[in-house]
Amino acid sequence: MGYNCINKKDLSGKVFTIPTNDANPYIKLHANINKPITAMTMCQRFNSGLERGQTLFSLATKSADNELMLYKSSLGTYRVHVRLRSLDFFNLPDGINEWISLCWTWDSKTGLTQLWLNGKRSARRVISPHGTITGEPSIVLGQDQDTYGGGFDPNQSFVGDVTDVHFWDKVLSPCDIKYYMHGQIKSPGNLLNWEALQFTTNGKVFIEKSDFIC
């Protein structure tokens, strides 16, 4: 499977647009990860017209395909995967054809995980306590990795716009997450930083201007 050359860009004010419903388009993100992940926060904004399930974030290693995976099952229902285990969150604030600001946190010490959507948070749940994510990660936007870097299913693909993707190796404070929800960043992600993003694209993926804040 070939990739285009690695880009490193400040994508402030830009979005990735994936307009087609198939297994070809995706974005591979190249993260600055040099130690095991024992806590994390991943934030992004997305806008999609799909009602079916779709994958928002997929991190695989050579030993496990669903090390970290965030899947929108249906309107208001989201599934998180950590270390091959999964949890469903229901009745979350959601919408179609509108911007959704989302953050997902997980701390291996306790296993506590939580979702934030448009400023409102879910209840905290427990998944994979004391788990550690090791090995070279493959991080993909737009598709679910059923194998390391591949195994894509078009029925789980994302169609729409995604922007402001940040990934930290810690759980952000509620105040920092609320800043993000309002379009501000106190400190960019140290693993993935939208303002200095390293990425490759495959298939019909376009970089367009964002209308989240005008």
Language-model features: locations:
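Extracellular glycan-associated modules
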Residues: M1-C214
